[in-house]
Amino acid sequence: MTLDVSKVQTPMRIDRYLTQQVENMTRNKVQAAIEEGRVLVNGKPVKSNYRVKSCDHIHLTFLRPPAPELAPEDIPITILYEDDDLMVIDKEAGMVVHPAFGNWTGTLANAILHHLGKDADELDKTEMRPGIVHRLDKDTSGLIIIAKNPTALHKLARQFANRQVEKVYKAIVWGVPKAESGTIKTNIGRSHKNRKVMANFPYEGAEGKHAITDYQVVEDLGYFSLMDVTLHTGRTHQIRVHLQHLGHSILGDETYGGATPRTLPFSKSEPFTRNLLELMSRQALHAQTLRFRQPTTGEPLSFSAPLPEDMELVLEKIRTVMTASQS
């Protein structure tokens, strides 16, 4: 892993800096890596008390245990559609899509292998992503396409790359945008302050990758909004980062500013928002609609998944309290 230290970074011990910047990294792990010569700054080994400076170039070599073999697991999944080439699954919040460091079991990939049985032998399991065409964040619910053979995987991946797949999400956000609809265009890349999260950069700049998101307010809830959000690109955390950039973070999004209780201009609003966040213990984001073409026949396919129970409950609470506060 390489990290380029921000121009505005204040001096900080390298063990502390890497603990902040690298996911699942502890100070003990950093110090062990430094002692073993696996941390280089500007091409040279350093000690734990080295103070990181602006524009330093850090290279960190990980020593990770070999990944276990991907195994089928009997995990219930909701399949909305299945044919010889693909499945469309309504993923529940809290499920990781594929195994990775820290999450080797209990993933959607494990469930897919169990469901397909011997048919899964056609799929490449070496990268722990059998049939997975695209991803959803762990705590985002909703629709995901799974290819059942290499040809379908290739053709579906090409549809995504050519932006021929329509993806529409439902999001509950804090506040009501001034414009009922709009397009957000920025570059998205790793944050300079914390490499574990993504950040917005100028669209015409050199940093990050182009990201384009459309939004449409479908219900004005007074101090909240229910939105349709359409992705034109597929960057990591794109919707969450873009809605924070708009000034309307997704309710419950701990990483991007949506999980702190707020005081609103009506009586007992803070206990109310605190209760909402207890009910919505994740980002209120649901991949509701997918439109694409069947990879063999070219037939247009369209799918929609109902809002999950937690989002429906939160919407009901908001509507009830907003109606009472305005009466």
Curated annotation (Swiss-Prot):
InterPro entries: PsdUridine_synth_cat_dom_sf (IPR020103), PsdUridine_synth_RluA-like_CS (IPR006224), PsdUridine_synth_RluC/D (IPR006225), PsdUridine_synth_RsuA/RluA (IPR006145), RluA_PseudoU_synthase (IPR050188), S4_RNA-bd (IPR002942), S4_RNA-bd_sf (IPR036986). It catalyses: a uridine in RNA = a pseudouridine in RNA. Transmembrane segments: none annotated. GO terms for molecular function: RNA binding; rRNA pseudouridine synthase activity. GO terms for biological process: enzyme-directed rRNA pseudouridine synthesis. Pfam families: PseudoU_synth_2, S4. The active site is at D137. SMART domains: S4. Keywords: Isomerase, RNA-binding. It comes from the Bacteria. SUPFAM superfamilies: Alpha-L RNA-binding motif, Pseudouridine synthase. Residues 12-84 form the S4 RNA-binding domain. Its EC number is 5.4.99.-. Belongs to the pseudouridine synthase RluA family. This is Uncharacterized RNA pseudouridine synthase Cpar_0723. It comes from Chlorobaculum parvum (strain DSM 263 / NCIMB 8327) (Chlorobium vibrioforme subsp. thiosulfatophilum).
